[in-house]
Amino acid sequence: LINTTEKNKFQPTPTDLSRYNINGLLIASPGNPTGSMIDREPLEALVNYCADRKISLISDEIYHGIQYDMQPSTVLEFSDNCYIINSFSKYFSMTGWRIGWIVVPKEHVRIVERIQQNMFICASHASQILAIGAFEGKVELEKNLMTYKENREHLLNALPEFGFNNIAPPDGAFYLYIDISEFSSDSYDFVKKMLDIGGVAMTPGIDFDPINGNSKIRLSYARSTPEILNGIERIKIFMKEKKYLQ
């Protein structure tokens, strides 16, 4: 694992990579748990860094389509010699159907095909038919995106009022990665109390970062807006009851 910094939105940079001897790099933009995205120029710098050193670059672009104030860039804008992973799970809301795709450099297609066939033959026929149909659901999918956007705005407006002042830039996806160091040094204990007492489910940062994750929690806003508003009120009550909020 490459240690990233809050300064760079928890995304790797060539400077970060220079400290490691690596043969491959996996990036995610938008990412989970932060929701942050790599800007176009830094992404190009990563592509060039890897190309110059013959480092295989794998770009997880599964959350493409779910973004707010900035447009995502793909590594294919800068090179054909990268691997791109994508899926119907997130933007197309087909998580349980287990279907996606990968873009591979032409000379590696057969290699990747053999690896894939050793794990499974193909996605189920039903999943493939539904995936084709998903392309016709643009209106519904954009409505989902508007719901995420509204939920995001409600949370970004409310959470600082409860003392959550340090949140990773939620450029895309549907997560907030929140610093709780002012309240706790044990993210698991914090989210357990939030669930048991407040009735709101969050994810402890240690699930994503065993070194620095005890000061972070992840919150998902991929629900209906009334549910998010209900959750905001519950968080407020919890923070007051636990004396975190005066």
What are the functions of these language-model segments?
Residues 112-119, 134-157:
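Structural signature of PLP-dependent enzymes
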Residues 52-53, 162, 198, 242:
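Helix C-cap/helix->beta junction micro-motif
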Residues 132, 148-159, 167-180:
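Conserved glycine-rich beta-strand-loop-beta hairpin in the small C-terminal domain of fold type I
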Residues 1, 57-59, 86, 202-204:
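Hydrophobic residues in well-ordered beta-strands that form the structural core
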Residues 4-69:
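Active-site phosphate-binding strand-loop segment of PLP-dependent enzymes
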Residues 107-127:
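Active-site C-terminal subdomain of aminotransferase-like
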Residues 78-111, 215:
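Active-site PLP attachment segment
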Residues 193-202, 208-246:
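PLP-dependent enzyme catalytic core of the Aspartate aminotransferase-like
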